UniProtKB/Swiss-Prot annotation:
It comes from Stenotrophomonas maltophilia (strain K279a). Pathway: Glycolipid biosynthesis; lipid IV(A) biosynthesis; lipid IV(A) from (3R)-3-hydroxytetradecanoyl-[acyl-carrier-protein] and UDP-N-acetyl-alpha-D-glucosamine: step 2/6. One of its GO terms (biological process) is lipid A biosynthetic process. Gene3D superfamilies: lpxc deacetylase, domain 1 (3.30.230.20), lpxc deacetylase, domain 2 (3.30.1700.10). This is UDP-3-O-acyl-N-acetylglucosamine deacetylase. It catalyses: a UDP-3-O-[(3R)-3-hydroxyacyl]-N-acetyl-alpha-D-glucosamine + H2O = a UDP-3-O-[(3R)-3-hydroxyacyl]-alpha-D-glucosamine + acetate. Pfam families: LpxC. Its cofactor is Zn(2+). It comes from the Bacteria. GO terms for cellular component: membrane. Keywords: Hydrolase, Lipid A biosynthesis, Lipid biosynthesis, Lipid metabolism, Metal-binding, Zinc. It is an enzyme of class 3 (hydrolase). Catalyzes the hydrolysis of UDP-3-O-myristoyl-N-acetylglucosamine to form UDP-3-O-myristoylglucosamine and acetate, the committed step in lipid A biosynthesis. Zn(2+) binds at residues 78, 237, 241. The lineage of its organism: Bacteria, Pseudomonadati, Pseudomonadota, Gammaproteobacteria, Lysobacterales.
Amino acid sequence: MIQQRTLKNTIRATGVGLHSGDKVYMTLRPAPVNHGIVFRRVDLDPVVEVPAKAELVTEVTLCTGLTCNDAKIQTVEHLMSALAGLGVDNIIVELSSAELPIMDGSAGPFVFLLQSAGIVEQDAPKRFIRVLKTVEVTEGDKVARFSPYEGYKLGFTIQFDHPMIPAKQSRQEIEFSTLAYTKEISRARTFGFMRDLEYMRERNLGLGGSMDNAIVLDEFRVLNEDGLRYADEFVRHKILDAIGDLYLAGGQVLGAYEGFKSGHALNNKLVRALMADATAWEWVSFDSPATPDPVEYATPAYA
């Protein structure tokens, strides 16, 4: 039986927004059964709540952003990814600004925060979105696809003409579980190229970016003194992003995801296409002890 999960305790963190450069205070609070993931802009009067739902995505340029009642929540994908990785269904995320803190550019610090707060099971079965038929979206040569699958599997291929991103390190696939996520995916950082810096600055993007929270490349090499955490950290981060983007479906997907040069825009388009076709998916729960669990979540960590 897989039950819903929330936090045991409230926990707080401070950081800077990757794109805004603004300092932000974040508070993660427990939430009741079937509450879902809800962001709360506590700097606004009155306070505005923004549910983590794919249909509220309005920003897909270099991040995933939500808008509800004119209130924006930017760069949600890394926290959403960590919540998916640890199986957290219900949580309140309070923010003092419009953008989540970027932390170190990965989901690792969010995983640490969630584990430090403690994760508890709730008295209700976890609800999954089971893919019943293949759904695919494209944009030029970019592809994102869901296919039926017993568990949750993600594959991703990137293509960059750069000596640090050779073809042999441009493809990765994982069978999703908490262990695989925390060890193989969660610490992969976001990345950017020096050549794109001017473009980003003109659009007020990346204002909080630095080598402390991103991998930075020039035309030939990685500029960060500490180098890479994984040889294929770039494609692993794309999987990290996809896990977060797909969790905006409103539940954990059961199926196989395949991305080819996909990004936030195409991932959101895929989720919307899936949810728009009532014959392509169904809600399922696993509340019988005799039923094998389709996804392996770690035993809750009680803080």
